[in-house]
């Protein structure tokens, strides 16, 4: 059920920039921890990346852990065909990138200069231009290999190696149906209460025990373990996530986030309702750097209305990153590290190492002209290098073409009562939403999510910075929303929901910060009259010089006739000098 109604923007508010917050994962663990000590072990979060291609599936699990830093082990369940050579350890960076790439985001729109008739530019258009100039994040758009004689192809500079890590684990694979608790006990570990009963339904899976070397643990905050992701590959179906096991160490609610990377399809849960969260709605500026707190509270409201519902928060091609991008698109080396290297093993040799096409006469002449002044030995070396480079470029172009995917993000918050069965994932129709651009004084934009042929779905929350300086033209073109001005000195960052498991659910109230009506959730902002329209949001046809709006850029101070607006503008300009330092967006006024 779609939760996002049509947008009507009612106001804006600002808050001074604070310190950056560091993104942290949030999800639920498909396994459990056992310790050699009496101190309780807790887990609040884990993220799961499931990468699929044909019969092959590669799963990466990054757990959260809170407990003693010595003498503990992690138990996961894997398909029966998994062997130790199919289990490896990754750097956390790869899962962190997926999280940042797909997380719900806060985007700021700025009213463009009403006296500048040029086209409106968006922040992601700037990003795309940079990518195009550099051959794209995966090397797409690089010169053809035939042009390598005169200009090096960008594919030559790609990192095309999968990265693995010498992790902190000692892996032991038990046979399906093995007595895991007995094995743990014989090795000095104490399984959590109820482990034996919880494991019974999973007799067809193999227990994977990862004993943790305390000397290799990375710490965050000085005393909390930050464990590396564990990756395994299988040719058996892996569409059911054994998440109920994570309840054995759960002190309260857990957040389950599943990333699915598939060549063609978006994914949803098949045994739970999947809905689209509100997207493309307006938020007060105070939520900008507290997106985790806001989203926690919003999801609580969603679950009250739609209990036991997964959120489909993101579905986008892997060579993109949303609008705006919170980080760069996934690199080919990252895709290989997350599982594409396994898929490459089944690619025929001729496809992995194709022959370069023959040079045309013009290309051959251009190359010979470029080496005609070299000494014989240098000429031979250059010819050999050129041949190798052409072969490398063709191979890498094929590699890039083979590894294009759709990245889906599913999110669920649960406890023992709201997870009666393990979630099952499956393909779903393509979805697009959260990308419509705002128009007019109120920044009206469609909040609808539609299914169709293209995956361009994101969860975006908007904030608007109306034009502050005095308008000095006769026919201003108002309310064109785009990217920040070139001379804006504030932090150019896309803020995302982060560290949900450790953020408050009550400090940021959706009833206060949401400025778009969402009747389905009972969120109906106060009528415009109570907030008063913004002073500078008057008629676009007002002749220059038009009064500026409230210098603080908050809600309006008045909407009277021209003389009243003129007085309000004078007061606004005075206030700008007082509060300018506390309002990053007032740097916008430097343009006048």
Question: Which sequence ranges carry the predicted segments?
Answer:
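Cleavable N-terminal signal peptides
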Residues: 15-16, 25-26
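C-terminal low-complexity, Ser/Thr- and acidic/Pro-rich disordered "stalk" regions positioned immediately N-terminal
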Residues: 520-560
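N-terminal signal peptide c-region/cleavage motif recognized by signal peptidases
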Residues: 21-23
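Short acidic, Pro/Gly- and aromatic-enriched capping/linker segments at domain boundaries
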Residues: 140-166
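N-terminal secretory signal peptides that target proteins for export/translocation
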Residues: 1-7, 588-592
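Accessory, solvent-exposed terminal regions and/or long lumenal/extracellular loops of proteins
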Residues: 30-42, 194-535
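A cross-kingdom C-terminal cell-surface attachment/processing module
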Residues: 566-587
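Surface-exposed, glycine/proline- and aromatic-rich loop segments on solvent-exposed faces
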Residues: 51-117, 185-209
